[in-house]
Regions:
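N-terminal glycine-rich phosphate/adenylate-binding segment common to multiple enzyme folds
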Residues: 65-151
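A glycine-rich helix N-cap at a beta->alpha junction
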Residues: 47-70
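Short, glycine-rich nucleotide/cofactor-binding loops
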Residues: 3-18, 205
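Single conserved hydrophobic/aromatic residue that forms the stacking wall/gate
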Residues: 259-267
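Glycine-rich phosphate/diphosphate-binding loops and the adjacent beta-loop-alpha structural elements
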Residues: 183-244
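Histidine-anchored nucleotide/phosphate-binding helix
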Residues: 16-28
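Phosphate/diphosphate-binding glycine-rich loops and adjacent basic-rich segments that engage nucleotide
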Residues: 129-189
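Short internal beta-strands
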Residues: 32-39, 225-227
Length: 267
């Protein structure tokens, strides 16, 4: 059994979400291969090759992967899919965009946001907004999975790299093109990887009061989150939202202020 894990990167570094999610592969027997794509990514390829547990790293250095499109990445994985039984990625925006398409192309079911692996065909995931845990068994010959990063610790980095292979981007579809993106800039840590989070709800009453949380967060080195009600009221932008319809978080310290209900939905 061989596993292929898609590794994401940003700003010249392997993403924290991928480092955590790839730890799930240690619960699967057999070799683990990584796939990383982009252009001018020699330094991040060198870093990724040192992830413990990887026996091989494939990379594509091509301008067409400067911005990930589901159609292109899916086709790239399909080009090498014959060698693999398991396909994993972190349950990020990219992972949630690509893996369902891959599953459809392979004519198998996709299992979302697993938090543990019990056996070769048995996986654990949360349901009902985290209030119940489901054990899912599949008879599909190929398993396509997204992994909840917050359920795993970051993979260790070794002192030497694994085998590195460069592959070519061939037969890439052209049914969509990247137009642009708008990124929110913040001095605060990213919510999904923050160790400390301070979060406010509708009781904050307005956006000006939310700025008080920023001052506390600065002292704590924390990220700032918000409930859906606070976001819907326009107090803060959408990317602040935590919970069932927002970002899944698992900090070491979570401070929930001013009317945030059902905190289990935030984990």
């Amino acid at each position: 059994m061989t596993t292929l894990f898609f590794i994401e990167h940003a700003n010249g570094q392997v993403s924290d979400q991928s480092l955590k999610a790839i730890s799930a592969t240690s619960q699967i027997d057999g070799d683990v291969h990584g796939l990383i794509v982009g252009s001018d990514i020699d330094s991040v390829v060198a870093e990724a090759s040192k992830i413990e547990g990887l026996s091989k790293l494939m990379h594509v250095d091509d301008d067409s992967f400067n911005n990930i499109l589901a159609e292109n990445l899916t086709q790239l994985i399909l080009n090498v899919s014959g060698d693999y039984e398991y396909f994993l990625a972190a349950a990020t925006t990219t992972g949630k965009n690509v893996m369902p398409r891959l599953a459809a192309k392979l004519d198998v079911s996709q299992i979302s946001e697993i938090i543990a692996i019990e056996g070769p065909d048995t996986f654990i995931r949360t349901i009902y907004a985290g209030n119940a845990i489901a054990t899912v068994q599949t008879s599909d010959p190929k398993k396509v999975l997204t992994v909840r990063p917050t359920a795993f610790k970051s993979a260790a980095m070794g002192s030497s790299g694994c085998e590195i292979t460069k592959i070519n981007a061939e037969n890439m579809p052209s049914i969509s093109e990247f137009i642009g993106e708008e990124l929110t800039k913040s001095d605060r840590p990213e919510l999904t990887s923050a160790k400390t989070i301070i979060s406010g709800g509708r009781g904050m009453q307005n956006g000006e009061n939310f700025e008080l949380l920023d001052k506390v967060a600065e002292k704590l080195g924390a990220a700032v989150g918000a409930s859906r009600a606070a976001v819907d009221a326009g107090f803060v932008p959408n990317d602040y939202q935590v919970g069932q319809t927002g970002k899944v978080v698992a900090p070491e310290l979570y401070l929930s202020l001013i009317h945030i209900s059902e905190p289990t939905r935030q984990w």
